[in-house]
Every structure is written in C-alpha cells, then in structure tokens.
Amino acid sequence: MVGKISSDLPPGFRFHPTDEELIMYYLRYQATSRPCPVSIIPEIDVYKFDPWVLPEKAEFGDNEWYFFTPRDRKYPNGVRPNRAAVSGYWKATGTDKAIYSANKYVGIKKALVFYKGKPPKGVKTDWIMHEYRLSDSKSQTSKQSGSMRLDDWVLCRIYKKKNLGRTIEMMKVEEEELEAQNVSTTNNEIEVVGGPQTMKLPRICSLSHLLELDYFGSIPQLLSDNLLYDDQGYTMNNVNNTSNVDQVSSQQQNTNNITSNNCNIFFNYQQPLFVNPTFQSQ
C-alpha cells in the first residue's frame, strides 16, 4: 500500500525499526503524548476490524503494518485483554519476549495468530500480530479501577505469513523433471570399461567412428574373443590380459582387416547396433 503521507517522506525511506526502537521511540512517545520521530503509525482499534481490512487503514507499509491501539478488559475486574474481533479472534502463541534498552527492562513483545470463528473451534489463518507494550503499563492501568480500558496504547505490527506450500511443490516438480531427464540421458548411452578410463558410447555409430577413437584403446583388443560381458552386455573386461599381450600386438597390425563379424561380436548386447553399410563385407 502506498502510504497517505509517502509524499512527505524522503526517497528510499524504509520503516524497519527494531523491537527496542519501537518501544523507546514510538510506543513510549505515544504513551507520554510526545510526537514520534516519524508520524506514520495511525491510532486505530485493531480489534474492531478483521486483519485483512487493516492494510487499508495503515499510513505506510506494503508487507507489514503498524498501529497504535487501545486494549480493553475481557472482564470488568480482570486483567486479561479482550482479543475478539469482527469475524474471529486473536490467540496468543509462544512465550512473551522481554525487550531491553541499555540493559534495562523496557517492554514486552507478544505474538498472536488470528482465528476465524469462535473459540475453541476457530480456523487458523496466516495473519500474525506482534503486540508491544510498556513494562510499566500494568501499574498505570491498575489505577483505572472500574474501567474496561486495560491499556491506553499498545503498538501492533500486523502482517500475513507467506504461504510456502506452492513454492515447495514447484521445487519438487522441477527436481523430478531433472531426475527424469538424467535417466533418459543414461538410457541412451552405453558405459564401456576398458581399463583405467571409462567412457560412454552412443547406441548408434559407424565403424569409422570407432577407428577414429584412438584414445579409446586398441580396437583389436576390444574385438578379441576374450571379452567378458555381464548379463546386460554393457560392461566388458579383458579376461586374459597377460596371456594375450602378443596376440594383441599382432592384431594391431591388422586393424584395417576388421570385418563386420568382429563388430557384431563387440556390440553383442540387447539393443541392436546399426553399422554403416560402407564397412559391411561384400
């Protein structure tokens, strides 16, 4: 909401006071009828409105709104405040927080949540109130015997808690899509272990492509009859590396005479391999 007095504020003005500042420079000034440093906190009885109506009553703020409000007693001779509103009630949550200034106890902060309906079956909402009151407020109001007024002024900060449900849900969806994409990429690749290096080959390739992979290792070694396949045919290891050194050396001299039968032996796995017809035997 654009504040009614925003034109009187300097450019870039932000109102984010600390708990101590709210007590010492705003609530205390209001309680003693002194002008506040900035007059942007209106005087409104917040219990006469539902919380979603209050932003329209605020002087300043987009995500949180401040108000000076009185508090009335729930019972004539009691000290409990009346928390009832138009269509619900405010319920205290957590423990009160003591506020100090220069190691001196100066105020109390209480957190409340708005519930729709009547207690004890009210429906919890996302509207939150932080209520600030002076530490000596009880001693002042105790003199007002017979009056329903409990406090002349307390300071309230009201805001709506952000709903993170949709954000978390979107993060899960994006994570699932990323996992599905990774699985699809893995299924379209074949992992070949031929020594210290591991590489992945596409399912469809030509024999000329294999011959160009000089970094892959010895082609005849890979095409030998001593390769061991697992049950899925994806991982291949040379069983007799020691005994076949001479054989491998001899086969390296005949690389150009590789036939399509050897190629079929090398790619003997469940998914068919498409070999460039140029290299098929005539």
UniProtKB/Swiss-Prot annotation:
Keywords: Coiled coil, DNA-binding, Nucleus, Transcription, Transcription regulation. Expressed in roots, stem, flowers, and leaves. Residues 9-161 form the NAC domain. It comes from the Eukaryota. Pfam families: NAM (PF02365). Residues 161-188 form a coiled coil. Its main location: nucleus. GO terms for molecular function: sequence-specific DNA binding. InterPro entries: NAC-dom, NAC_dom_sf. The keyword Transcription applies. Disruption phenotype: In plants lacking both NAP1 and NAP2, delayed leaf senescence but enhanced fruit yield and sugar content, likely due to prolonged leaf photosynthesis in aging plants. Transcription factor that binds DNA motifs 5'-CGT[AG](5N)NACG[ACT][AC][AT][ACG][ACT]-3' and 5'-CACG[ACT][AC][AT][AGT][CT]-3' in target genes promoters. Promotes leaf senescence and reduces fruit yield and sugar content, probably by establishing abscisic acid (ABA) homeostasis. This is NAC domain-containing protein 1. It comes from Solanum lycopersicum (Tomato). The gene is NAP1.
